[in-house]
């Protein structure tokens, strides 16, 4: 059994990196510790130009770099030095003049950055597939009992600290080994994804006609947290995040206080945050079981998120109990005070939190308070995944949204400016409500939300019941539907409760009947041409 605490001293290191962040300082410290350094190409030149003593790999192996750098480190004196088992292979290493290499610091050609450049063609992508680097990484990782492999610049400081204490323990080398295999797995997966989208029949080998979906789907996530249980107590669970999230979200959030996030907390907080990101003016979204139960935009700048919260809460005070609250502005003291004095809340998330607000929420020690950072107005394209038994559904994320200019008026009466504002507000909310989704809204406040019903007209009835229960007046509100109305009964029901304007995608075989129902009731209706199913 390997001793977990015995430290391995480092006498010889091989350094060859594409990303040179921190490498010069790392090499200088290694040199100061008496470590002999082998290096290649641009890394060797950087060290040499900055006074770090190093031996070029070509001089050590006696074999010059060739084929425009394609062959540099693929040599027995390199891989024998990395793979050689101390105490087992010593004689054969000595016979062939192979010196042990105790530490390998390598990161790989920037394949991802290359393929993301506009106009990248297949030959360019191929030249940025690293061969020698992954080979050294895997060799060192395989022989982690005797060799330390460092692929992340973030590990340089910790490695140096350990070397100054006498060397790296087996536990540390094992952790570095795991990071190395994760690194090469992600790299190979990225290459496979890319190559799987290239049109093989393209004579020019251009990648402009690439398929959107690769032949095999490879993606890597990093474990951020193990959870007490999953969606239900009998299920185990963990939260994994992307190495480089495309934009601000639940995966980038910092927890400032409160109990550990649960599986359901993460899912619900994601739903709340993604919804509130849809709004430009100060807004609040309250979510329960992944559905918005109250959403509002502050009617004036002075009201801020405090006023938005009051209006969102008023939509459904019962469902807000134990909910998730998200804001698109910094959480201030007044809003924090209003929340903690009024209701039980699981999670509060905002781009940032004032010190005064933190102090107020601290009085409720169990409340999970998160700051996620400010997001860009531009939504990043990304993939959505849905696991099915034996497979995975993959689609582009629904980042589609419309403006007033995109609306097609299909009724005799056109909506007023106020109705248009409310229609777009309700449409943004409906996008985040489980289908079939119906949202009633007035003055950019949700009046009633009907979610997740098998019948669209029943969702509309539930939205009206919710509004009545909350003491809110449906008459004079607008209605949003995430998909088309298959029959006119949805509009007849809307007329009955006093809806004045409707927004929906359109596209039903009976659109003419639905439009006629709206005209009969004097309801203005617009089509978006875009559906927002959410399952």
UniProtKB/Swiss-Prot annotation:
Pathway it works in: Purine metabolism; IMP biosynthesis via de novo pathway; 5-formamido-1-(5-phospho-D-ribosyl)imidazole-4-carboxamide from 5-amino-1-(5-phospho-D-ribosyl)imidazole-4-carboxamide (10-formyl THF route): step 1/1; Purine metabolism; IMP biosynthesis via de novo pathway; IMP from 5-formamido-1-(5-phospho-D-ribosyl)imidazole-4-carboxamide: step 1/1
Record has Transcription regulation as a keyword: no
Keywords: Hydrolase, Multifunctional enzyme, Purine biosynthesis, Transferase
GO biological process, one term: 'de novo' IMP biosynthetic process
Pfam families given in the database record: AICARFT_IMPCHas, MGS
GO molecular-function terms, A-Z: IMP cyclohydrolase activity; phosphoribosylaminoimidazolecarboxamide formyltransferase activity
Protein name, as recorded: Bifunctional purine biosynthesis protein PurH
Species lineage: Bacteria, Pseudomonadati, Pseudomonadota, Gammaproteobacteria, Pseudomonadales
């Amino acid at each position: 059994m390997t001793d977990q605490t015995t430290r391995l001293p480092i006498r010889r290191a091989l350094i060859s990196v594409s990303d040179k962040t921190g490498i010069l300082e790392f090499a200088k410290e290694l040199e100061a510790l008496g470590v002999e350094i082998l290096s290649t190409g641009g890394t060797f030149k950087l060290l040499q130009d900055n006074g770090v003593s190093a031996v070029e790999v070509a001089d050590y192996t006696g074999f010059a770099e060739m084929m425009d750098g394609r062959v540099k480190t693929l040599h027995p004196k390199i891989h024998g030095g990395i793979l050689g088992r101390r105490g087992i292979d010593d004689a054969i290493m000595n016979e062939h003049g192979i010196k042990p290499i105790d530490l390998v610091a390598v990161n790989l050609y920037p394949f991802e950055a290359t393929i993301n450049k506009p106009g990248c063609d297949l030959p360019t992508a191929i030249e940025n597939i690293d061969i020698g680097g992954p080979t050294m990484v895997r060799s060192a990782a395989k022989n982690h009992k005797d060799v330390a492999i460092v692929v992340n610049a973030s590990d340089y400081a910790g490695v140096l600290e350990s070397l100054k204490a006498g060397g790296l323990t087996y536990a540390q080398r094992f952790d570095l080994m795991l990071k190395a295999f994760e690194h090469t797995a992600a790299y190979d997966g990225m290459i496979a994804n890319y190559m799987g989208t290239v049109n093989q029949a393209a004579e020019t080998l251009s990648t402009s006609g690439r398929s959107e979906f690769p032949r095999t789907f490879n993606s890597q996530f990093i474990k951020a947290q193990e959870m007490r249980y999953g969606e239900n107590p009998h299920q185990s669970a963990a939260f994994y995040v992307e190495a480089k999230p495309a934009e601000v979200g639940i995966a980038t959030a910092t927890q400032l206080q409160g109990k550990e996030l649960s599986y359901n907390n993460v899912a619900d907080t994601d739903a709340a945050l993604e919804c509130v990101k849809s709004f430009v003016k100060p807004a609040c979204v309250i979510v329960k079981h992944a559905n918005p139960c109250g959403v509002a935009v502050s009617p004036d700048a002075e009201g801020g998120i405090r006023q938005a919260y009051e209006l969102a809460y008023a939509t459904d005070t019962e469902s807000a109990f134990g909910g998730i609250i998200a804001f698109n502005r910094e959480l201030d003291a007044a809003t924090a005070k209003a929340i903690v004095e009024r209701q039980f809340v699981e999670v509060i998330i905002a781009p940032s939190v004032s010190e005064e607000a933190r102090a107020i929420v601290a009085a409720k020690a169990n409340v999970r308070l998160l700051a996620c950072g400010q997001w860009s107005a531009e939504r990043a394209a990304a993939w959505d995944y849905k696991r099915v038994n034996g497979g995975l559904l993959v689609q582009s994320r629904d980042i589609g949204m419309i403006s007033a200019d995109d609306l097609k008026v299909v009724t005799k009466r056109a909506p007023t400016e106020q109705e248009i504002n409310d229609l777009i507000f309700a449409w943004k909310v409906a996008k985040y409500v489980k289908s079939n989704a119906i949202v009633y809204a007035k003055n950019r406040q949700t009046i009633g939300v009907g979610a997740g019903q098998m019948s669209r007209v029943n969702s509309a009835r539930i939205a009206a019941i919710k509004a009545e229960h909350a003491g809110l007046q449906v008459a004079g509100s607008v209605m949003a539907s995430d998909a088309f109305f298959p029959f006119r009964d949805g509009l007849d029901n809307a007329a009955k409760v006093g809806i004045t304007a409707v927004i929906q995608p359109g596209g039903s075989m009976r659109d003419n009947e639905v439009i006629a129902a709206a005209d009969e009731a004097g309801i203005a209706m617009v089509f978006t041409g875009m559906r927002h199913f959410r399952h």
